[in-house]
């Protein structure tokens, strides 16, 4: 019951009272529920004298799989409702299926995590025809939703899980090994195919991985730190595009906060050290499974395999259900080791778990309250309220969110709208140092222009344009800046560049910029 609450909250929790009500609220809700249920269940186990001798039921497939079945069903039902048009996904890129997430990647991760547990439950049904009917329905439903959400990575992850189950049913050891080898070759071939087949998407991935390689080469041993990717990626992307001879890649460059590959993220943030530690963990887990094979450990390995494949093309660890799935999968893989621990050791581990859960609540609850206050301030500012109350609210929250680039950016924006451009520059610069991205560079350029620091504005407009060459706004800002400074030759040069620039997305803003540039160039001939 406790695990079910955490799993369900990981997919349904949503609020409009937080700056990021779709993802952050899922983490906060699941975190509070997890810590609370751990404390309550541990206390109850002591009171009822079941404590460390509770037996293996807590780590059984049924106990662990049912919560993921519930979470998966919620995602499937929500997705089907969106597919019928009864409820809209309201996503700007036109995705029809989001199921309460901010991105189709959330749907893919939830289904990839839940699917192996659903198959494990179906496999335990006694009637053969019911078993195969449930499995078939699960496969068809999941594949259909992943196809509609355009998640090739999700389909590949589910396909790997299906093939692992097929191989698992083979009784002959030699045949099973041959089938496993074929599976490895097949997965490798599909991964290569997915990396090169869809030209636009995979050219974008190639750009990101190329920039990641540059970052890795600069810090190969220990990486750039915990948030190194978000701090430095866009600056590296600007340099990469400066020396890039391709005309395609600049058109694909965008504001990037994740490399769309969890392994690349580990390599950039933690270097070879992180990759080696990850590899050691994988090898130890596989070795333990091979030496202690059971139904429980096999289910755990299929979950880990699905997440591992999905991590090559997406960011499943952005979502709390993935983390919960990994923890439960590891419990199943190491179930025999855990059950063989002495009563004293298990009691000690339970005590440590309770203390960690209490510490988690002490940290999470004030953080959730601060997030709620920030959400209220954000709503007030979005409604046009840049008054003293909003500014005082941001000032009070600053010590708690001084390392959050999104908060600092919001704070700077509110200050700028209130006319306090010098203070806005300070917080925007802090945000840019924590997360160098296109939006903050453009804000710093506009703010410096308002302050009359035109040389700084020029540099940030140029940087924003180098980060995302496909965007028209930085060049137009530079065009207007040169016009105000009376630098006619440079103004005409930028104007011609704007007029001859390929348009990736035809919008009202782009048409307005093009018409304004044409008119001003005619006037200044």
What are these regions (language model features)?
Residues 1-70, 121-134, 166, 174-180, ...:
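Transmembrane signal-anchor hairpin modules in multi-pass inner-membrane enzymes, especially those
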Residues 7-14, 24-42, 56-93, 99-172, ...:
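Alpha-helical transmembrane segments of multi-pass inner-membrane proteins
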Residues 86, 146-149, 154, 165-218, ...:
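A membrane-periplasm/extracellular boundary helix in multi-pass inner-membrane enzymes
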Residues 90-95, 226-268:
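Interfacial juxtamembrane loops and adjacent helix segments
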Residues 209, 222, 256-264, 302-305:
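Alpha-helical membrane-protein architecture signal
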Residues 278-373:
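Long, contiguous interaction/recruitment modules in multidomain scaffold/adaptor proteins
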Residues 396-397, 430-431, 463-464, 497-498:
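Canonical positions in the second alpha-helix
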Residues 417, 450-451, 484-485:
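Register position in tetratricopeptide repeats
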